[in-house]
Amino acid sequence: MIKVGATRVLEDFAQIINDTISHLEKEDRIKSPIHKEVLKLECTAVVFWFFRYSDVFPESIRRFTLDEVHQQYLSSLKRNGYSRDQVQAVCDELNERYKTYDAFMSKAEDFVGVGTSFARFVSENAKTGLDATEMTIVIDLIDQVRLKFKEYREAMAA
């Protein structure tokens, strides 16, 4: 049951992330292929991180679901040609990003700190100039994920 649910969650998250990237491409906001890949990774980190704190499922189910989402995501990277070392690097990077975002939330900061960190990470790793408008990507992602969580809640209540 968790595997099936996690597959659905991962598909929904992937759709949100892909739609976000497509929207950025249409607005000519993606500066290079590396910029696009860094944005994908960071969007994934934000969405997975936000799911960790959601109350859409009871805590134990949420943890199992997130573990399975991670496993399926990392397996998809392997299927798409990533080496074991590259997959481990992505896993390590996700964990580092979670720690960074956790630090903002533990200080009772709002999502401005998360958005700033997001934009800074993208610019540093994509070797682009800091684009302050990228801070808003976090808000857009979280809004879309919240809508998806609302759908899950409604489906569970039915």
Task: Report residues per predicted region.
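Short amphipathic alpha-helical segments and their helix-coil junctions
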Residues: 1, 5-35, 124
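Context-gated lysine
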Residues: 3, 26, 31, 36, ...
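Short runs of predominantly hydrophobic/aromatic residues within well-ordered alpha helices
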Residues: 6, 10, 36, 40-44, ...
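Extended hydrophobic/Leu-rich segments
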Residues: 13, 17-20, 24, 42-43, ...
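Alpha-helical repeat scaffolds in large eukaryotic proteins
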Residues: 18, 22-25, 48-56, 74, ...
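N-terminal interaction modules that seed assembly of large macromolecular complexes
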Residues: 19-64
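Long amphipathic alpha-helical segments
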Residues: 48-115
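Low-complexity intrinsically disordered segments
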Residues: 87-158
